[in-house]
Amino acid sequence: MKKVLCIAECCCDLIFAGMPGIPGLGEEIYGSDFVIKPGGGANTPISLSLLGTPVSMLTALGDDDMGRQIGQTLKKSGVRLWGRQHRPGTRTAVSAVMSTDTDRCFASYGGTGGLDWDILETAIAQADIVQTYLGYCRQQPIARLCEKHGKMLCVDANYADVRDREAALAALPGIDYLKVNEQEAVCLSGCEDAEAALSFLGSRTKCGVIVTRGSRGGIAMDHGKRYAFPAVNMGKFRDACGAGDNFAAGFLYGISQGKTFPQALESGSRLAGLAVTWYGGNDQTLNCTKLDTMF
């Protein structure tokens, strides 16, 4: 099985689950549950590792209780950490997540850490597949180092990454696979719809692009061939937080096992469907047997 390196910052998710609505200014609303879990960039490597994939992560955890709690969960999950952790005075990013039956919203603090970019090449050289985010590819020589060492580069994006279209598009030729949601695809491509965006973006990466569409599944392109995949209902919906991160984990799980592109898409769709049955973007009950049984 191929080794995966994830490059991302982590945050601590404070999840107010089962909210009947979102409070306005001066209002207070009670949810049915409350959970604290690692979030952000931690979701993909945790799920990958729980599925049995060898995973390491270049990240930075703060010198506080939340940073130490995230570190314990990552290590418990089997994720190897690259970089200096808990440096004196650093603070962990935090997101308060208010989750309703249909969607969620966030109030976040960005933290004061920073990744140890001086060890970037060493970390990349020891992996087979590198997973990171478009913003990092714009700022650091990740694509160049992956090319130098012959590593596959799979990149996720968020809306903030794609708003600067010129800079984001300039990064695409160094990327093997780009994963975006429908809104991000339209924004980045400048096209009117997801289908046109798929063709536009797919022609600018090395291998292809995946466009996720929530409950409508998604569309993808690999070496010029179009694919469509459905959303998969894996149980009672609880929380949409981390569905995209887990699609990425499922896709990478498939690729690391040598599955075909459409098989890897199916793995991603099924793990995303499973993720929305949890509160938060990861769950320690996940294992390979559980996912394979659901296949």
Predicted regions and their residues:
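Short, basic and Ser/Thr-rich N-terminal targeting/leader segments
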Residues: 51, 90-92, 214
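Glycine-rich phosphate/adenosyl-contacting loop at the front of the ribokinase-like
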Residues: 1-60, 65-69, 76, 237
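Ribokinase/PfkB-type carbohydrate-kinase core domain
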Residues: 1-11, 72-86, 98-227
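Residues at secondary-structure transition points
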Residues: 32-39, 65, 87, 91, ...
